Amino acid sequence: MKTLNRRDFPGAQYPERIIQFGEGNFLRAFVDWQIDLLNEHTDLNSGVVVVRPIETSFPPSLSTQDGLYTTIIRGLNEKGEAVSDARLIRSVNREISVYSEYDEFLKLAHNPEMRFVFSNTTEAGISYHAGDKFDDAPAVSYPAKLTRLLFERFSHFNGALDKGWIIIPCELIDYNGDALRELVLRYAQEWALPEAFIQWLDQANSFCSTLVDRIVTGYPRDEVAKLEEELGYHDGFLDTAEHFYLFVIQGPKSLATELRLDKYPLNVLIVDDIKPYKERKVAILNGAHTALVPVAFQAGLDTVGEAMNDAEICAFVEKAIYEEIIPVLDLPRDELESFASAVTGRFRNPYIKHQLLSIALNGMTKFRTRILPQLLAGQKANGTLPARLTFALAALIAFYRGERNGETYPVQDDAHWLERYQQLWSQYRDRVIGTQELVAIVLAEKDHWEQDLTQVPGLVEQVANDLDAILEKGMREAVRPLC
């Protein structure tokens, strides 16, 4: 069986205009996949040079396949049909290691055509590393490497204002563009680089904050033989991902034209502020997950897909989204409903087995950040507690018993909550406390909730009533009136 290379698989090759820090599965099935579509359907005509930002020899270099690899995008499409689409990606030209090819790395700045910098160096990548110096070959941190590369470009083109870059980080931190820019400026000042360079950074370059959204399942280890048989070639960099994707970029409106988004419709939004989109994702996608998990798991289900194929549990989640979460969010309702529809479709993806117990990790913090804001906003707006979000809190407290149908299961959270719940449920079983007292103790934890939730009118009583129903009737019977 042939292995991918450009000699045996000839096709388009594009001039290098994009530098990408990070060789991982996510960028390859997200950014490079989108660039490949734009190259095919528009005159974007841009090739990617991947820079491996850390010192590692695994996985091998993409250059062993001349930058070629296959994405397999699968899930439910907009009509709810299961689809699986294999695509040979030609947007990546080569990969270089900043550690073994440092001079080659600096030479990227000399190419007048270079225009974009994308990155995904993990959440820890956009951080300050004390001791990084200008002359290090290379510096340790990604922001320091980028500062050095930007200075190389500034010097090579004598500070020309038309030679700046559009820098688009994809790391999962809030306002990642602002954070990266601040660190680049910090290194520039620490290294005593000329004031003219600092002015050029501001005038000629754009640091764009982003929100990225796609589940990338990566190399399909268990299915490789079958997939390669279907493809007819060997691919050591096969990359799988869900059908849904969303790329929100906070940047200049001109970016849409530069990326040729006006010529081919991708799910990319160029916006003035990513905040409402971040809130939408946290509230609807993450919030629905967090509400679903303790209810579905204690109803005897194990995966998100099983839960969405269960008529009652699915109805509970959809009503929570449409009746209790969406009404208190600050974006146009039709936009929110369209996003919610995509979310429930993603939950039904038959190609992804998303274990409920793995999503249950750190459930107490997830409830505080993902659901509590909507629960409180709903109470404030309507004067009544949103029934399903409140029930989800009772289900969460019940989940920390760590037992389903007489069998124990692992509960993963910080030590404080594990010990606290062990103690509280033990006291409940010994009849030292009742449900009302148990709930009040949990809701009074100011350090966790950042407020005393026992002061929210009716909350302790309603959560305790829901908890009683769960303990007495079982989850199925208790949740039914809310479905």
From Swiss-Prot:
<feature type="binding site">
    <location>
        <begin position="18"/>
        <end position="29"/>
    </location>
    <ligand>
        <name>NAD(+)</name>
    </ligand>
</feature>
<dbReference type="Pfam" id="PF08125">
    <property type="entry name" value="Mannitol_dh_C"/>
</dbReference>
<dbReference type="InterPro" id="IPR036291">
    <property type="entry name" value="NAD(P)-bd_dom_sf"/>
</dbReference>
<comment type="similarity">
    <text>Belongs to the mannitol dehydrogenase family. UxaB subfamily.</text>
</comment>
<dbReference type="InterPro" id="IPR023668">
    <property type="entry name" value="Altronate_OxRdtase"/>
</dbReference>
<dbReference type="InterPro" id="IPR008927">
    <property type="entry name" value="6-PGluconate_DH-like_C_sf"/>
</dbReference>
<comment type="pathway">
    <text>Carbohydrate metabolism; pentose and glucuronate interconversion.</text>
</comment>
<keyword id="KW-0520">NAD</keyword>
<protein>
    <recommendedName>
        <fullName>Altronate oxidoreductase</fullName>
        <ecNumber>1.1.1.58</ecNumber>
    </recommendedName>
</protein>
<keyword id="KW-0560">Oxidoreductase</keyword>
<dbReference type="GO" id="GO:0005829">
    <property type="term" value="C:cytosol"/>
</dbReference>
<dbReference type="InterPro" id="IPR013118">
    <property type="entry name" value="Mannitol_DH_C"/>
</dbReference>
<dbReference type="GO" id="GO:0019592">
    <property type="term" value="P:mannitol catabolic process"/>
</dbReference>
<dbReference type="GO" id="GO:0008926">
    <property type="term" value="F:mannitol-1-phosphate 5-dehydrogenase activity"/>
</dbReference>
<dbReference type="GO" id="GO:0009026">
    <property type="term" value="F:tagaturonate reductase activity"/>
</dbReference>
<dbReference type="InterPro" id="IPR013328">
    <property type="entry name" value="6PGD_dom2"/>
</dbReference>
<dbReference type="Pfam" id="PF01232">
    <property type="entry name" value="Mannitol_dh"/>
</dbReference>
<dbReference type="GO" id="GO:0019698">
    <property type="term" value="P:D-galacturonate catabolic process"/>
</dbReference>
<dbReference type="InterPro" id="IPR013131">
    <property type="entry name" value="Mannitol_DH_N"/>
</dbReference>
